[in-house]
A protein has these predicted regions:
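Short amphipathic beta-strand and strand-loop transition segments with alternating hydrophobic
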Residues: 29-37
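Conserved Nudix-box catalytic region and its N-terminal flanking loop in Nudix hydrolases
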Residues: 10, 68-82, 86-125, 142-145, ...
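Nudix hydrolase/Nudix homology domain
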Residues: 4-25, 29, 103-104, 115, ...
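Active-site segment of metal-dependent pyrophosphate-handling enzymes
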Residues: 44, 81, 96-100, 105-107, ...
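Residues in well-ordered beta-strands of folded domains
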Residues: 49, 63, 79, 109, ...
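Acidic, metal-coordinating catalytic segment for phosphate/diphosphate chemistry
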Residues: 37-79
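Short, well-ordered strand-loop elements centered on a beta-strand within folded domains, enriched
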Residues: 30-31, 56-62, 86-95
Length: 233
């Protein structure tokens, strides 16, 4: 529950044994006002006043980035596939310590979109900085939300192919900024979820939900649904 938000449920009428439904919508939900509670260099906390589907006025605590550019997503996530002769295709991943989590996380390379950048340009720049690899964009998703119950942060997922036989990619060099400590991991595409699960058993690490969902999708692509490891747990 957040800032007075009520969770809608379907309950049972004990007298009749029939299911009762939530109230029917009577209006279109909309924002009334947004007030800044606190603001830092990168983030701000706001109190959002809104009207719910049945006309009640409520409040919500919302976090927002201070760096958002007009008409653009906040950042990009990069699914980069490294292709090399006589090697399995590998997904390029990054491992780094995240202070909010208090431990290391396994993520796709990612970063904020700078002013004037497209998602494609931002993705290639961030990939080069974080991993040292030079790639080619092969696909871009629409703008998607990250954690809509907490913030208005958005991202675009950019698919990139990396020619591992290219001389520039045989010995990639990261271009990290001050305070950035990023370890690059190459996980075979056909063993992606297994590699993630093994890593979680060996280390104190949290996997980004987007990464794990991608792993489940790859498992479904390579194996029958009833053989998914996650379904056997």
């Amino acid at each position: 529950m957040n800032g007075g938000k009520k969770i809608g449920t379907i309950s049972t009428d004990n007298s009749t044994g029939k299911m009762s439904s939530p109230p029917k919508p009577t209006t279109i939900p909309h924002i009334v006002k947004e007030e800044v509670i606190a603001s830092g260099k990168w983030l701000k906390l706001e109190k959002t006043t809104y009207v719910d589907p049945v006309g009640n006025t409520r409040t919500w605590e919302t976090t927002k980035r201070t760096t958002r550019q007009a008409n653009a997503a906040d950042g990009v996530g990069i699914i980069a596939l490294l292709k090399r002769t006589l090697h399995k295709d590998c997904v390029v991943m990054v491992k780094q310590f995240r202070p909010p989590m208090g431990c290391c996380t396994l993520e796709f390379p990612a970063g904020l979109i700078d002013e004037g950048e497209s998602a494609e340009i931002a993705a290639l720049r961030e990939l080069k900085e974080e991993t040292g690899y030079k790639g080619e964009v092969v696909g871009v998703t629409p703008v998607t939300c990250l954690d809509p119950g907490l913030s208005n942060c958005t991202t675009q997922i950019v698919m990139v192919n990396i020619n591992g036989d290219d001389l520039e990619n045989t010995n990639p060099t990261q271009q990290l900024g001050d305070g950035e400590f990023v370890e690059v991991l190459l996980l075979p595409l056909d063993e992606f979820q297994r590699e993630i699960d093994d890593l979680m058993k060996k280390e104190k690490i949290v996997v980004d939900s987007k990464v794990y969902i991608y792993g489940m999708g790859m498992s479904q692509a390579f194996f029958k649904p009833n053989e998914l490891r996650v379904l056997k747990q």
